[in-house]
Amino acid sequence: MDTEYEQVNKPWNELYQETTLGNQLMVNVGMEDPEVPLLPSNFLTKVRVGLSGGYITMRRIRIKIIPLVSRKAGVSGKLYLRDISDTTGRKLHCTESLDLGREIRLTMQHLDFSVSTRSDVPIVFGFEELVSPFLEGRELFSISVRWQFGLSKNCYSLPQSKWKVMYQEDALNVKPSKKKASKTDSSV
């Protein structure tokens, strides 16, 4: 199932976004850094960017995975980024298997990927190799993605950047609130 998309024609230094069917993806080219939820999907998520001349690369990518279930649900999977400019779906990056019952934040400086601004940016974000005792396990978490574009006159390849797990914690644990003691100790 291909994802429909709209053509985006705005100056490169302005913030713009593109909404796709099934997924929502925020493409951030400005200084602001908003978040838009990206629902888990194994379908294609294309990004089309209208820029004039040059090449673009993806940089400063941050992904937050927010569980909607307990860790006891046993939902896990690998986050893949794929180049779908042809039918092979070349793997750009893949994380290790992630426990999707925990909140996870991932960051990457850049993708080893460059594409002409006159074409689509054929990047797929999606979970594969999902493991869950429930058939609906793929829908038991949500993702938000933040990224920016780098613009260059030349096509170049960067050394592969690794995912960094910023932190992984049990997001469903109730954290005790920090309250000041209402009574003071009055010892005579």
UniProtKB/Swiss-Prot annotation:
Main localization category: host cell
Listed InterPro entries: TBSV_p22
Superkingdom of this protein's organism: Viruses
Modifications after synthesis and translation: Phosphorylated.
One Pfam family from the record: TBSV_P22
Keywords, alphabetical: Host membrane, Host-virus interaction, Membrane, Phosphoprotein, RNA-binding, Transport, Viral movement protein
Sequence similarity: Belongs to the tombusvirus/aureusvirus movement protein p22 family.
Quaternary organization: Interacts with host protein HFI22.
Function statement: Transports viral genome to neighboring plant cells directly through plasmosdesmata, without any budding. The movement protein allows efficient cell to cell propagation, by bypassing the host cell wall barrier.
UniProt protein name: Movement protein
Organism of origin: Tomato bushy stunt virus (strain B8) (TBSV)
